[in-house]
Design a protein with these regions (language model features):
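Positively charged, solvent-exposed patches that mediate nucleic-acid binding
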Residues: 1-128
Length: 128
């Protein structure tokens, strides 16, 4: 598996993002929240991901961009957790909901836990 986060793996389509926020479900592991939705997207990858940091909590764009870089990097290195356990295509948005700027180690560990929670939820849904 390549540990890259290419253009086709990124969630960019406005309609998909709107549908994700209106119909999607969420999983939380503070300070991260993941909104996810099973869908039929046109990408060759099993999931598309987007990251967001609210302007309300971080006024400076420099801070928001740094946190988004941390989120993308920690997802990129751990995406095999999701790829090895999914059968249907998903789109999801990972949001940082904390109030202070995180350090990378914290984000990495929280992302790992969040991805495992997501996999458990999808397996529960599949078993029902």
């Amino acid at each position: 598996m390549k540990y890259t986060l290419g253009k086709q793996e990124r969630l960019k389509r406005r309609k998909l993002i709107e549908k994700l926020y209106t119909e999607g479900k969420s999983v939380k592991n503070f300070p991260l929240r993941m909104m996810y939705l099973q869908t039929q997207h046109t990408s060759d990858f099993p999931c598309q991901v987007g990251v967001s940091v609210p302007k309300r909590n971080f006024k400076l764009a420099v801070s928001r961009n740094r946190i988004k870089r941390l989120l993308r990097e920690s997802y990129r290195l751990q995406k095999e957790i999701v790829y090895n356990n999914l059968e249907e295509p998903y789109v999801f948005m990972i949001s940082y909901i904390g109030k202070e700027e995180p350090v990378y180690e914290e984000v990495f560990l929280k992302m790992q836990k969040l991805l495992n929670l997501f996999v458990e939820k999808t397996k529960e849904i599949k078993n029902e």
